[in-house]
């Protein structure tokens, strides 16, 4: 009799355990969207972002770095050998995933010191760790200019908020093309 009660209690215990709801926020939906950027050179603050207008979502990385130039002036300012590495945190260097109640204009939302007021963030996840690597690949060189492809990659990043945590070992934010005068 005791064995039967024990088995019933054990079955009820396992049946009552729950892993909770599985929430999957696809971070790879941004792969076809254009990488955009802006900066405030006086404050040494920079933002790279992609926006999925179909779902009103954005993924952005903002950081402060006194040595980084969003538009390098010379070829000497670009290294194809070593990427620029920025350590993410919860305050100054962040990867942000946001969902909005309406579509947004990236320049208006990310590039103004005061964001537009008629847009509400319905979900926000903020990085708690990880790194951002900004790497350059030589595309073409002429007598007057050099063209690079710049890739923004997050490594070992965790973004969290509202009881949700998402971890990615590798997440490519996007690429853009920059031209530097020789």
Residue ranges and their predicted role:
Residues 146-148:
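Flexible beta-edge/linker motif
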Residues 153-182:
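Edge beta-strand at a domain terminus
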Residues 52-144:
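Surface-exposed helix/loop patches within compact recognition domains
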Residues 57-61, 150, 167-171:
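Short beta-strand segments
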Residues 43-54:
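Short, hydrophobic/proline-enriched secondary-structure or compact coil segments at domain edges
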Residues 1-17:
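Sec-dependent bacterial lipoprotein signal peptides
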Residues 14-45:
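Bacterial Sec-dependent N-terminal signal peptides
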């Amino acid at each position: 009799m005791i064995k039967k009660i024990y088995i019933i209690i054990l079955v009820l215990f396992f049946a009552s355990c729950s892993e909770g709801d599985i929430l999957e926020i696809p971070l790879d939906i941004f792969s076809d969207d254009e990488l955009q950027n802006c900066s405030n050179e006086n404050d040494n603050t920079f933002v790279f972002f992609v926006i999925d207008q179909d779902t009103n979502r954005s993924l952005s990385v903002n950081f402060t770095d006194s040595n980084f130039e969003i538009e390098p002036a010379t070829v000497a300012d670009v290294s194809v050998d070593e990427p620029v590495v920025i350590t993410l945190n919860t305050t100054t260097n962040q990867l942000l995933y946001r969902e909005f109640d309406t579509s947004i204009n990236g320049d208006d939302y990310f590039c103004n010191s005061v964001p537009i007021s008629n847009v509400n963030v319905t979900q926000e996840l903020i990085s708690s760790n990880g790194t951002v690597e900004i790497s350059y690949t030589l595309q073409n060189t002429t007598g007057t200019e050099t063209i690079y492809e710049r890739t923004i990659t997050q490594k070992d990043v965790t973004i969290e908020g509202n009881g949700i945590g998402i971890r990615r070992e590798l997440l490519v934010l996007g690429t853009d093309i920059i031209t530097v005068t020789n």
